[in-house]
Curated annotation (Swiss-Prot):
It catalyses: ATP + H2O = ADP + phosphate + H(+). Its cofactor is Zn(2+). This is DNA repair protein RAD50. The gene is Rad50. Its main location: nucleus. Residues 200-534, 635-673, 706-734, 754-954, 1019-1075 form a coiled coil. ATP binds at R13, N38, G39, G41, K42, T43, T44, V67, D69, Q159. GO terms for molecular function: ATP binding; ATP hydrolysis activity; DNA binding; double-stranded DNA binding; double-stranded telomeric DNA binding; G-quadruplex DNA binding; identical protein binding; metal ion binding. Its EC number is 3.6.-.-.
Length: 1312
């Protein structure tokens, strides 16, 4: 049997659309309860179960209001999803999912059902199937094991449809027919009856058909006899035709032979003519070729061929030599390219090596300068002048390393001393902090205890204060209790319940008499209606005619002016529809134009935005480029600045070269003047007169030599800056070009495009405004006409109905002629109204007495409750007075503890203040130590780092110098210069060789051209001799053909050919006559066979036999159908009566155990046979109604019961139907079952439901789902052993529904 286990809901009604809003509910067995206030979303759960099981939406919605509103969610699209996990009738797990989509359009919401998914779990694996809605509906009905009507009307009945058992007759009949599946069985009986009638008709048709089949069978036998006779005549005719054919065959062969010889003669004659024509053409061609040649070769053919072949061989050898020269020339060109490439690479390498040599000298000078600077800074002796040797440099590094170690050691010692002092201060601070923290924790603990004790003390004092007035309250309670008991006794004594009950019995008897009188009047009214129906119909038709005339007049007066202004006249429906169609077409065309213009405007706006963005980018790019250019140049005159900078670099380069050369010259001059004892100036050869003059020159040269390196360094530094600036400016050349392009081309073009687009946009806006104005004029006219169309359609319908009414009035008037009745329907109806008024009065008195009984019972119950409450309060006060002394002692004890705690907290706070002052002082001393440590450490580190940086720079220069020497760059430079000279020599030799080959190739091309002319003359001679040979062959072939024709006897062949044709014609005529007779026989035979193949004669005997079998078989089948129809009809009646008896028994038991009123003993469903069914119609229909019984009286419950009785009756009928029809599905959902029920009936309903659960608790798949807002009703159900948990349905802060599982014990403590 099937049962539901779990369901998740997302995006349905008030359930949220986010994943976090998804609500999952697990269904308990046997009872699941959902509690919540109105609007929380309880009924939505029933709607979800119904939708996922049947695919039907709740009443009054087609789906769009079933999904969470997109406007509320502030979303365009809202997806809803419901998933259900359940067990099918076989106990297998099934998961089903249905999804929906609701989209918010401009004026309405659009709903769409998405594809559903059914998933089964077989052998631990999921098997999913995507299905359409109809397929899922069928699958769900199959899985749950109940019909769709039972699911909709019994198991998951919606709250709005819950009272359907008391609906009007037609709707009630339809519901019960669907539940009983009566329609299907009635259709089955109809089908059986129709089949039986069809089979009977078929028997008659078979008998008629057999008559004609017997005639066809006899006719077929006659045709077969005629075919046998004609086939014998045909055989004789065929032998005659064959004799003629044998005689004709040798004549045809001889004729064929003669025709072959004649065709051969014709062919030879044609060939001779063709050879004559070919001979003339060949002679003409030879003559033309001889005229074209200057002279004809006179030697033999062998001499001509040898001369031609030798000539060709000479030409081929020269061409091969020409190709070889061409290859050699290409090879030399390739070799020259490689040599040029190698020369370029060597030139680049030579320049690079020269630059490295210059840089090497610069590194040596920079190293010596740094050593002198650092030695002076560290006060090291022996390093005042350079250059320095390797030993001096090594000694310098050793001295610097020792100095670094001394500085590092001193700094480390100072840092260590300051760190020790800092750690000492930190330890002192930690000790004080620990002491302070301990006091703080103690204060917190004592304060917390103090707060608790103070709260406890206040509570005890409040209770004592309340108890002070308890003595007086006991006296008041005694007085109130005495008064309440007196009132209770008085109320019980004055109660008239028994009298009222007796009066109710009398009134019920009177009511029964009035009911009988009313039924008699109904019978009389029915008899009168036989004659008065016509009169009533006449009156109704006359009134209907007046009403329709008035309606037509109103419609015309309401729309006459408006339609006349639109069309110029008052139209009929067809004219107005045509006008609307043309107007709608005009509106659609206008809308299309407007949409197209809007699309063009959007495109233009987008283009404008794109152009604006592009213009803004270009302007920003121009500004950025100009700023960069100004930052580098200092002005906007880029070209002039660049030219001036190049001139400055050239000047600085010359100055650097001069300073570099001056250093070498000054050194050489000083050496010459000192080492060689030269007495004259090395530059001007002037002789020095004295030693002092010589020393003065040397001193001057040394001074210039000392200043030269600094000047050289300064010049090089300035040159590098200028070169860097030049490189930066050269790098900005493309940017300068971009600035020019932006200013002169790109930005002006964009501005022009922007102006053009703005003009287009303005034009489009004007067009759109014009179309919108037109649309605003036409659309109100169309809307106005549409409103009028509805009324015009109604008016035309009224006019047609008016004609029909007038015709019916005439018919009824003819029927009323001569009719005269004494007692009218109005008189009977008036008497019936009087009786009905009395009946209503009696019913009102019964209800009034019942209300009085209920009011008196409620008053007595209220007084009893009040008495019990006063007794309970008095007992509680007496108990509290006994605890008074204990609370006073507790007050004294608590006051003492509070005072003690206050003292302890005060002492602790006084100890904390001195600790905070000392701690602050230590913190200040510690920060001073840290500052001293950081300052001294920074100074020492800066000094050490400065030395390290300078040593690092010296090492860098030394490494570059060593690398240059170790790499052998000087030798490598000389080697590359030698290689360059060799490449230049090879390149010159290659050019000379190429020139020589070019001359040789020119000579050979001239020789080849001369040889080609001679070759053409030899070739023409060969062609001429070949054609002369072919001409001789043609003449020989012509002579041979003439000789062959002369040997044939042409005249004799033609005479014989003519005689043979005459003989053959005679035989053919005789043959044709014989063949004609043969074809006549064949056609007759074919005609008979064709006639025999016609439908009525083909297989006539077999058809006759088969039809006989069909007729006998159909007769037997018809008898069986008659038996089966009667059996099924009897079974349907039996099933219906058994089910109705079973349902009514359950309804009686449930009503008696639930309903606490005395006016209705029980209720039941009556199924009466349809009295309107004619005797000829064998279909049996049932009309259903719910009746209430008191004694022997049964009344229709519809229209007579109260709202509470209606709810209870509908609920009990659904319970009975579920008990009867849900054998495979033990699920039942009750939505607000306590609606309109009083407290007594609510309690009895709860007791009845518990009994139902108890009786079906052994059925493991029984599931009752109860939805209610009445927590008292839930508490009554919770007193049973079947409820431990229930669900609360509520709205969260986002006003989305939430489902929360709660314990049944939490009912009393829950606050809405």
């Amino acid at each position: 049997m099937s049962r539901i286990e779990k369901m998740s809901t997302l995006g349905v009604r008030s359930f949220g659309i986010e994943d976090k809003d998804k609500q999952i509910i697990s269904f308990f067995s046997p009872l699941t309860i959902l509690v919540g206030p109105n609007g929380a979303g309880k009924t939505t759960i029933i709607e979800c179960l119904k939708y996922i099981c049947t695919g039907d939406f709740p009443p009054g919605t087609k789906g769009n209001t079933f999904v969470h509103d997109p406007k509320v969610a502030q979303e365009t699209d809202v997806r809803a999803q419901i998933r259900l996990q359940f067990r099918d009738v076989n106990g297998e797990m099934v998961l089903v999912q249905r999804s929906m989509l609701c989209s918010q359009k401009s004026k309405k919401t659009e709903f769409k059902t998405l594809e559903g998914v059914i998933t089964r779990i077989k052998h631990g694996e999921k098997v999913s199937l995507s299905s359409k809605c109809a397929e899922i509906d069928r699958e769900m009905i199959s899985c749950l094991g109940v019909s769709k009507s039972v699911l909709n009307n019994v198991i998951f009945c919606h709250q709005e449809d819950s009272n359907w058992p008391l609906s009007e007759g037609k709707a009630l009949k339809q519901k019960f027919d669907e539940i009983f599946s009566a329609t299907r069985y009635i259709k089955a009986l109809d089908t059986l009856r129709q089949v039986r009638q069809t089979q009977g008709q078929k028997v008659k048709e078979c008998q008629t058909e057999l008559k004609y089949l017997r005639q066809n069978k006899e006719k077929a036998c006659e045709i077969r006899d005629q075919i046998t006779s004609k086939e014998a005549q045909l055989a004789s005719s065929r032998e005659i035709v064959k004799a003629y054919e044998n005689e004709l065959e040798p004549l045809k062969n001889r004729l064929k032979e003669i025709e072959h010889n004649l065709s051969k003669i014709m062919r030879l004659d044609n060939e001779i003519k063709a050879l004559d024509s070919r001979k003339k053409q060949m002679e003409k061609d030879n003559s033309e070729l001889e005229q074209k040649m200057e002279k004809v070769f006179q030697g033999t053919d062998e001499q001509l061929n040898d001369l031609y072949h030798n000539h060709q061989r000479t030409v081929r050898e020269k061409e091969r030599r020409l190709v070889d020269c061409q290859r050699e020339l290409e090879k030399l060109s390739k070799e020259a390219r490689l040599l040029n490439q190698e020369r370029a690479e060597l030139l680049v390498e030579q320049g690079r090596l020269q630059l490295q040599a210059d840089r090497h000298q610069e590194h040596i000078r920079a190293r010596d300068s740094l050593i002198q600077s650092l030695a002076a800074h560290l006060e090291l002796d022996g390093f005042e002048r350079g250059p320095f040797s390797e030993r001096q440099i090594k000694n310098f590094h050793e001295l610097v390393r020792e100095r670094q170690e001394r500085e590092a050691k001193t700094a480390s010692q100072l840092l260590s001393d300051l760190t020790d002092k800092e750690a000492l201060k930190q330890r002192q601070m930690d000790e004080m902090r620990d002491k302070k923290s301990g006091l703080g924790r103690m204060i917190e603990l004592k304060t917390e205890i103090l707060t608790k004790k103070q709260t406890e003390l206040r509570n005890v004092r409040n209770e004592l204060q309340q108890l002070e007035g308890s003595s007086d309250r006991i006296l008041e309670l005694d007085q109130e209790l005495t008064k309440a008991e007196r009132e209770l006794s008085k109320a019980e004594k004055n109660s008239s319940i028994e009298t009222l009950k007796a009066e109710i019995l009398n009134l019920q008897s009177e009511k029964a008499d009035l009911d009988r009188n009313l039924r008699k009047l109904d019978q009389e009214m029915e008899q009168l209606n036989h004659h008065t129906t016509t009169r009533t119909q006449m009156e109704m038709l006359t009134k209907d005619k007046t009403d329709k005339d008035e309606q037509i007049r109103k419609i015309k007066s309401r729309h006459s002016d408006e339609l006349t202004s639109l069309l110029g006249y008052f139209p009929n429906k067809k004219q107005l529809e045509d006008w609307l169609h043309s107007k709608s077409k005009e509106i659609n065309q206008t809308r299309d134009r407007l949409a197209k213009l809007n699309k063009e405007l959007a495109s233009a706006e987008q283009n404008k935005n794109h152009i604006n963005n592009e213009l803004k980018k270009k302007e920003e790019q121009l500004s950025s480029y100009e700023d960069k250019l100004f930052d580098v140049c200092g002005s906007q005159d880029f070209e002039s600045d660049l030219d001036r900078l190049k001139e400055d670099i050239e000047k600085s380069s010359k100055q650097r070269a001069m300073l570099a050369g001056a250093t070498a010259v000054y050194s050489q001059f000083i050496t010459q003047l000192t080492d060689e004892n030269q007495s004259c100036c090395p530059g001007c050869q002037r002789v020095f007169q004295t030693e002092a003059e010589l020393q003065e020159v040397i001193s001057d040269l040394q001074s210039k030599l000392r200043l030269a390196p600094d000047k050289l360094k300064s010049t090089e530094s300035e040159l590098k800056k200028k070169e860097r600036r030049r490189d930066e400016m050269l790098g900005l050349v493309p940017m300068r070009q971009s600035i020019i392009d932006l200013k002169e081309k790109e930005i002006p073009e964009l501005r022009n495009r922007l102006q053009s687009v703005n003009r287009d946009i303005q034009r489009l806006k004007n067009d759109i405004e014009e179309q919108e104005t037109l649309l605003g004029t036409v659309m109100p006219e169309e809307e106005s006409a549409k409103v009028c169309l509805t009324d015009v359609t109604i008016m035309e319908r009224f006019q047609m109905e008016l004609k029909d009414v007038e015709r019916k009035i005439a018919q009824q008037a003819a029927k009323l002629q001569g009719v005269d009745l004494d007692r009218t329907v109005q008189q009977v109806n008036q008497e019936k109204q009087e009786k009905q008024h009395k009946l209503d009065t009696v019913s009102s008195k019964i209800e009034l007495n019942r209300k009085l009984i209920q009011d008196q019972q409620e008053q007595i119950q209220h007084l009893k409750s009040k008495t019990n409450e006063l007794k309970s309060e008095k007992l509680q006060i007496a108990t509290n007075l006994q605890r008074r002394q204990q609370m006073e002692e507790q007050t004294v004890e608590l006051s003492t503890e509070v005072q003690s705690l206050n003292r302890e907290i005060k002492d602790a706070k006084e100890q904390i203040n001195p600790l905070e002052i000392a701690l602050e002082k230590l913190q200040q001393e510690k920060e001073e130590l840290i500052h001293r440590k950081n300052t001294s450490n920074k100074m020492a580190q800066d000094k050490i780092n400065d030395i390290k940086e300078k040593v690092k720079n010296i090492h860098g220069y030394m490494k570059d110098i060593e690398n240059y020497i170790q790499d052998g760059k000087d030798d490598y430079k000389k080697q590359k210069e030698t290689e360059l000279n060799e490449v230049v020599i090879q390149l010159n030799e290659c050019d000379k060789h190429k020139e020589k080959i070019n001359k040789e190739m020119g000579t050979m091309r001239q020789d080849i051209d001369t040889k080609k002319i001679q070759e053409r003359w030899l070739q023409d001679n060969l062609t001429l001799r070949k054609r002369r040979e072919e001409l001789k062959e043609v003449e020989e072939e012509r002579k041979q053909h003439l000789k062959e024709m002369g040997q044939m006897q042409v005249l004799q062949m033609k005479n014989e050919h003519q005689k043979l044709e005459e003989n053959i014609d005679t035989i053919k005529r005789n043959h044709s006559l014989a063949l004609g007779r043969q074809k006549g026989y064949e056609e007759e035979i074919l005609h008979f066979k064709k006639e025999l193949r016609e439908p009525q004669f083909r297989d006539a005997e077999e058809k006759y036999r088969e039809m006989m079998i069909v007729m006998r078989t159909t007769e037997l089948v018809n008898k069986d159908l008659d038996i089966y129809y009667k059996t099924l009809d009897h079974a349907i009646m039996k099933f219906h009566s058994m089910k109705m008896e079973e349902i009514n028994k359950i309804i009686r038991d449930l009503w008696r155990s639930t309903y606490r009123g005395q006016d209705i003993e029980y209720i039941e469903i009556r199924s009466d046979a349809d009295e309107n069914v004619s005797a000829s119609d064998k279909r049996r229909n049932y009309n259903y109604r719910v009746v209430m019984l008191k004694g022997d009286t049964a009344l229709d419950m519809r229209g007579r019961c109260s709202a509470g009785q209606k709810v209870l009756a509908s609920l009990i009928i659904r319970l009975a139907l579920a008990e009867t029809f849900c054998l495979n599905c033990g699920i039942l959902a009750l939505d607000e079952p306590t609606t309109n029920l009083d407290r007594e009936n609510i309690e009895s309903l709860a007791h009845a439901l518990v009994e139902i659960i108890k009786s079906r608790s052994q059925q493991r798949n029984f599931q009752l789902l109860v939805i209610t807002h009445d927590e008292d009703f839930v508490e009554l159900l919770g007193r049973s052993e079947y409820v431990e948990k229930f669900y609360r349905v509520k709205k969260n802060i986002d006003q989305c529904s939430e489902i929360v599982k709660s314990s049944i014990n939490s009912l009393g403590s829950y606050v809405h």
